[in-house]
Amino acid sequence: MGDTAVPVLWGGDLKNTLDFYRTLGYAVTYEQTRPYVYGAVEGNGCALHFGAEPRGTELPAESVICLVMLDDVAARHHAFTEALRTHYGKVPAKGYPRITRFRPGQSRFTVVDPVGNSVIYIQRDEPKDIEYGGSRELAGLARVLDNARILRDFKNDDATAIRVLEVGLGRFGAEAPRLDKAMALAALIELAIAADDPARSDTLRTELRAMRLTEAERSAVEGELRAAADLAD
């Protein structure tokens, strides 16, 4: 039998933290408050443990990260979002706790628990080589879209993804293939909703609706818009 590594994350308000993981479908396997705080949960063969933060130390936000490799990241994200929607009345997308968005073909997502621990769920066969800046095999707005995807999905850097898309549309939008432009607008709609900017989202939707897209092209942007709809619900 091989070694088993168990991450120990910050516990915070332990009851609240364990309740959050119960909501996600984990089973609480240990809970102790005296003489010190310690708890543990387990789900799908994966254990997460929680200990007390060091006293007198101000912890940087989201400084503790755990990676969980799994076989079907899309199914897990769906299960988590449904559980969170049932518990909170909506899918929490900002602050603590929250879950990052998910689109068709995406290979990872992040759950940030009430304490600020980040648990990143990753498709086991995720490609090893990520070309930051966008794939060199692409050009123009297509490469901009790939760069924005990496910033958004791998670095959780929505602000930079927005800037990259806006600059890219300004530079390449006039000559870009119609579908690439529509995908860029759809991505910006989702990012505007995540940034709590409904006015910007409405403006972008108007621009997207004005585009004369084929049925196939409209179908291609539905995944991006579905992520936006999940945020708005």
Predicted regions and their residues:
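Short charge-dense sequence patches
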Residues: 1, 20-34, 70, 111-117
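Core segments of cupin and vicinal oxygen chelate
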Residues: 9-48, 158-175
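Vicinal oxygen chelate
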Residues: 13-14, 66-114, 150-233
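Short, structured interface segments
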Residues: 111-129
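A general structural signal for short secondary-structure boundary/capping elements
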Residues: 55-58, 109-117, 144
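Conserved short beta-strand elements that form part of the metal-binding/catalytic scaffold
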Residues: 29-68, 118-123, 178, 191-197
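N-terminal beta-strand motif that seeds the catalytic metal site of vicinal oxygen chelate
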Residues: 1-15, 97, 126-157, 164, ...
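Short glycine-enriched loop/turn motifs at secondary-structure junctions
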Residues: 1-3, 58-63, 103
